[in-house]
Amino acid sequence: MQIVTDPAEMQATADKLRAGRQLIGVVMTMGALHEGHLSLVNLAREHAGTIIMTLFVNPSQFGPGEDFQRYPRPFEKDAAMARSAGVDYLFAPTPEAMYPEGFQTTVSCSGITRRFEGERRPGHFDGVATIVSKLLNITRPHVAVFGEKDAQQLALIRRINRDLDMGVQIVAAPTVRENDGLAVSSRNIYLTGDERQKAPAIHRAIQHAGEMLAAGENDLKAVAAEVAGMITENTQFKLEYAAFVDEESFEPAETVVKEHEYRLLIAAAAERVRLIDNQKFRV
């Protein structure tokens, strides 16, 4: 595995790979790697022969009071995990390299981002859209793999890829879960012991939503309300939202239309970390 820190060098390397007819797959991370990230690498390998992993804690997607300074950065461990997973190039630039003096451009997508995470984290998705656009331009991939756990982010990336004619195949990877159902996340280390015990209640509530829909419930607002009640009752987390959206448009959905796909989105705040989860349903 080759470690690259200079954007120009990474871009030149990617251009050479493309000239040699190598299919490039990219997996973007902020480090603190876990099994979820490794599953993205495995999926990327099914679509491409050369895998680039980006490792960059992006300051522009963190808001005031968020965890940019304390976000874990175990670089040596991450590099070892990437190497063991079969990553060919680890692109790990500095903030100064990605946002040099005089940098002025922001990529913004107003529709998909105006609710849910976008409403609660102002500026977050502008930071995501900007850095993803830059990293796609630098790594020149044919395929980019992103996890479904960050569903709104995935919808945003699909939209900017489409709107800006980037021509990258965006592949969605299923959420990886712990044995008790908790979605794997680098930030789970912030949970206290008691919070960690109660956190799987979120996934149980999602499963209950699936049971309600399978039994013929058509009122998505009622299903979401029951999900919210289960989470509030079984945890001390502050529920921020539990809502269904149309899978294609990401607009809020209230009533089932048969043979249609919806996604249940959930966010709940523990003492030091926000937990997000989601699930797609076809009804």
Curated annotation (Swiss-Prot):
Catalytic residues (UniProt): H37 (proton donor)
Pathway in which this enzyme or protein is active: Cofactor biosynthesis; (R)-pantothenate biosynthesis; (R)-pantothenate from (R)-pantoate and beta-alanine: step 1/1
Membrane-spanning segments: none
Superkingdom in the source lineage: Bacteria
Molecular function (Gene Ontology), one example: ATP binding
Gene Ontology biological process terms in this record: pantothenate biosynthetic process
Places the protein is found: Cytoplasm
Residues where beta-alanine binds: Q61
First-level EC class: ligase
Main location: cytoplasm
EC assignment: 6.3.2.1
Family of the protein in this entry: Belongs to the pantothenate synthetase family.
Subunit-structure text: Homodimer.
Free-text function comment from the UniProt entry: Catalyzes the condensation of pantoate with beta-alanine in an ATP-dependent reaction via a pantoyl-adenylate intermediate.
HAMAP family in UniProt: PanC (MF_00158)
Protein name: Pantothenate synthetase
Species of the source: Chlorobium luteolum (strain DSM 273 / BCRC 81028 / 2530)
